[in-house]
From Swiss-Prot:
The chain crosses the membrane at residues 4-24, 34-54. This is Cardiolipin synthase. GO terms for biological process: cardiolipin biosynthetic process. It comes from the Bacteria. Pfam families: PLDc_2 (PF13091), PLDc_N (PF13396).
Amino acid sequence: MGLLAYLLVILLILNVFFAAVTVFLERRDTSATWAWLLVLTFVPIFGFIIYLIFGRKLSGKKIFDWKGQEKIGIQESTANQIEMIRQKEFPFSDPNVKKHRDLIYLLLVNDGAILTQDNEVELFVDGHEKFDALIADIENAKDHIHLIYYIFHSDELGNRLMRVLERKAAEGLNVKIIYDAMGSRTTKKSFFRTFQKNGGLVRPFFPSKLPLINFRLNYRNHRKLAIIDGDVGYIGGFNIGDEYLGASKKFGYWRDTHLRVHGKAVYAMQTRFIMDWNSASSTHKIDYKARYFPTFHGKGHTSMQIVSSGPDSEWQQIKNGYIKMINAAKKTIYLQSPYFIPDASLLEAIKIAALSGVDVRVMIPNKPDHAFVYRATTNYAGELMETGAKIFIYDNGFIHAKTLVVDGEIASVGTANMDFRSFRLNFEVNAFIYEKQMVQKLEDAFLEDILKSYQLTPELYAKRSLWIKFKEAVSRLLSPIL
């Protein structure tokens, strides 16, 4: 055996040893561990390199700084709400909200998600309407504008928005942008040059410190938030790009869900932005000043909690909220997600609901955004059909909405998909809503989408080719790490 062969054997042995040690020492879900072991076994050496880039868990180093929040009373308010709910003394403004005390308590304890009850909420399901409203609010801003988007393209929509931001920065407003370094990888830094010259500040989230290599590549900031003057906020699924206006030939009409909020829930969005900004920026840190949390009384009646989650979290807060909602369902569960790859706990909760006679309807796209992810999605959908759940394929473009509506009484809207990535790897943010009128609008939007969909029946699903079945099997096997 030659020297090269000896070296190859040694490399293979080292690959297996270090791979096994690394994977098993990191605390992770069993299914993800097995998926990575398959990659490391069948793609030696290169598999370990892939693991180092995509598979490593975040270090124990604190990512977000919670200091300073005592200035605006967040910890005190959270503790007070927890105690009042525990003692059954919380002043719920709506009897319907009181019915969901357990879910509210869960999100308070897990995430410190304060319940606010004075919110005016406007629903957007079309990109043109959402961005027209956002740009109008930015035009009317008087003090500050804070934006965080996973994708910020330098196309027609991106330029339209940027021109307004440049002008507001030149007027002396405090304007800050966070974009995800991976999601916005095609956007050149020069796109922000005039904005920065005018006084605006921009930061990428988790950029690579080494050319072509990013050991935090797998951990992305998937949040989409806009906060204007501390009293108007936007949260939902729309990124910034022409495809979100239906301009993509591949996807066609883009169906998404976004909310405009005026009320105290905006405080939670502002807090989330400040934490993300201070994590992404080594300079120009934001303090919890009164200017970012103006005193006002919202005129709405929508009760809601803003819930964040990420790989730094002890608990998977958004997923836990989903499961709690599903377990509470008595009549209906309407779910939309472009990627439906639930873990065992979430899948089991949905199955039990369907088997218990709850009308479970899941809506997924009719075309792949990511090929492997789509085949895993159709495989899980096929399994869910066996329990009596109904699967609908959106056939009017691309469905990107991430919504869950239960019994026409509670709902969740935000950035988190129903998949492993959103629950374990991405930094996400969702609004949990407890007001029948607003929830009814979300339910109506879902039922309207059904009219633009076709049902995936067991007979139709059985007609899949052997090649499609093979792709589904492989994608399902690797789904914990997709």
